[in-house]
Amino acid sequence: MSNEKQQWDDAYCLAEEMHDAGRPFKREELNIADQFICSRFSTIFEYDPYKDTYGFRNQELTHAIPVKSKCRHISDVDILELKKNTANADIRFPSYLNICPVYAMHPFTVLAFDLSKPVPMGMNASMENAAPNMKSPTEAEITPGTIYIFKHRDNKCYRCVILFEDGDNNVSDADRKYMVAFLDTPQVVSVKLKTLFHLGKFTIESYPCALYCCRAVGILEIRKDFGADLNGQINEFYKDKVKRKSGVHALIYKKDDRGDKLIFDCPSILGTSMTMALEIKDVIGHRSVAENDPTALSYDELVSKQLPTVDIDDHNSSVVLDLEESVIAQELGSTNGADCPCNNDNIDDFMQSQRQNPLDNNRDNWDRINESRSSMQSFAINQSQAITANPTPQPTFDESSGEVQTIPESINNLALNGRYLEDGRGTEEIREERSVESRQIGNQVVSQASCNYLEARQNSTQTANAESVCAIISESHAALPTDIQVIPSQHVLNENNHTVLPSVAPIIRNATGHSHIFGRQIPSPAFRRESLSSGNSIQVATFAATTGPCGSNTSRPTAQNTANSSINQDMSISNSSTNARLITIAQDNLNDTENWPNSEREQSATEMESGAEATTNSAVDEFAQVSDDMKGLADSMINFLRLTANSNNQDAFKANIFAMELISTKIPNQLTKRFFTLKIAEAKSLAEGFN
């Protein structure tokens, strides 16, 4: 009784220390006596097998009223003797053993009984002879993992290991029950304290047992809640006496890194067509994996008892070790004297040789690198000079060779680094970089564009969608009034025309207030002249909805006439354009309306914007707060995607779609992100041109 009283005093002091510290204690911080006490008072202390710590269960304790002890469940730190027995086991690897799983504990150790190993000779008879002189342990001496001798009523004796305390502890010490696993027979039972005796001379070192410590291949730790489920499966297998005696054929791959556990795998003990390791991983779950374990065999391979391939057999392993030892000895011997490669003299000689001739070995490679670098710099200078001389962005077309076009790297870098500002307040450097990059996309010769356009028109195998995209690009330049005002606009699509138009295009208003949704007039062979009701004849060129082959409401002109007209218009645009963003030409037939009366000017604007045959539209811009830089970037990328779709260049198309999606993820502003999402949807719709 005095021993139990002393344990309670120590337990109360430990609980007070943990409560004051407000943290659990590592098991290594505690001495052997404190570890012994914490393992017995599971009602006060909680053990975490994954962190190897003891924590105080928050509750009210009174020193005057002792709390009865109760042993916790066995853990991996309590089976040191069984691990030594496993390390000394004479087992060939890999090989099959007929085992019976007995119990599973955290973090992950399965106690498995080897049915093929016999009981040590003469041990049972010796224990029966020594039974009358055996001493019983007290309740204060019982801890999980301790090995005792269980004495049956027929005087037969069996060695067993304590798993945990079973049943109610509100009984006398002699009637307390403990769940034990036998070391020499596959059995797990609950026994009373009065039937247990000290081990004496029948230790595992003297008489090795057949109970081994194992773990499933590829699994280092199981989930904390899965321990009870796994033990439930083992109990289902264990209750069948036929299965318990016959066991299951398990493949023993090898011992683990520490050498005290067997890495095994076997068909599912529940009868499913899965291995035990695969069932834990895929069906129930695990906590962590063992990366250094060998590759597990499949269920069929385990059933057919196949052995895994081994790279180095046992016969050659010693040779490899001898070679490694000789190499190490040679390296250690070479460190003496001036022959050491790290000697100061050798280091100085090496540095001096590198100073004298640093590039002789790779001079050719360096020359090629410098040449490529110089050519790239020259190309950039020429491009800058050409842009300065002629700031007009030219329409771009793919060459006839069909080269892969990708979006300029600088645009991708700017998008990835988030240098485009959504609120429109960017620095001048950002504005200049975006302007130059957008010009580089469209800096090709007009004559080549017109020729490629003519070839695309004459090619009979060109698809309808590709023709539509080509027509929009080649006919996207027309005369505009000199005084214009650019305001944003919403996305407008002609439902009867399948040609994809920019989702956010600027609305351009002239001095009279006239506007149209596309940002610039698209010339067409079908022009009409209409006079206003005021009597002052103002001739306006209107577009007759002939931009696409699919939704055209009027007859299309011939390809030859359209091509010739486009060539003449492009040449005229190249010679007289001065606007960097919009290509404008003064129209002779557009009269000035400044001297008109206000009533006639308002009536003219009304008829132009709401007339039945007029193709213009005025709308409130939903994305007015989106910066011009982002709009320009989106328009440039979509124009480039039209070219890739027209040239059937799917690789460049996919790459630039991916670039737009990546830019969208970098945008913090929700309005700008929604704007760019619509642009991405519009860009993806251009993929129909590949069909």
Swiss-Prot record:
Changing A11V: Inhibits piRNA-mediated gene silencing. Changing R159C: Progressive fertility defects at 25 degrees Celsius, with animals becoming sterile after 10 to 11 generations. Expressed in the cytoplasm of germ cells, but does not form germline foci. Inhibits piRNA-mediated gene silencing. Residues 549-573, 588-598 have a biased composition (Polar residues). This is Protein simr-1. It comes from the Eukaryota. Gene3D superfamilies: 2.30.30.140. It is found in: Cytoplasm, Perinuclear region. Keywords: Cytoplasm, RNA-mediated gene silencing. Its main location: cytoplasm. Residues 139-204 form the Tudor domain. It comes from Caenorhabditis elegans. One of its GO terms (biological process) is positive regulation of oogenesis. Tudor domain specifically binds peptides with symmetrically dimethylated arginines (sDMA) and may facilitate protein-protein interactions. The Tudor domain contains the conserved arginine and aspartic acid residues, which play a structural role, but lacks two of the four conserved aromatic residues, so it is unclear whether it is functional to recognize a methylated substrate. Acts downstream of piRNA production to promote mediator complex-dependent endogenous siRNA biogenesis from piRNA-target mRNAs in the RNA interference pathway in germ cells. Not required to identify target mRNA by the piRNA pathway. Plays a role in both spermatogenesis and oogenesis and in maintaining fertility over multiple generations, probably by directing mutator-dependent silencing to piRNA-targeted genes. Residues 547-573, 588-618 are annotated as: Disordered. The lineage of its organism: Eukaryota, Metazoa, Ecdysozoa, Nematoda, Chromadorea. One of its GO terms (cellular component) is perinuclear region of cytoplasm.
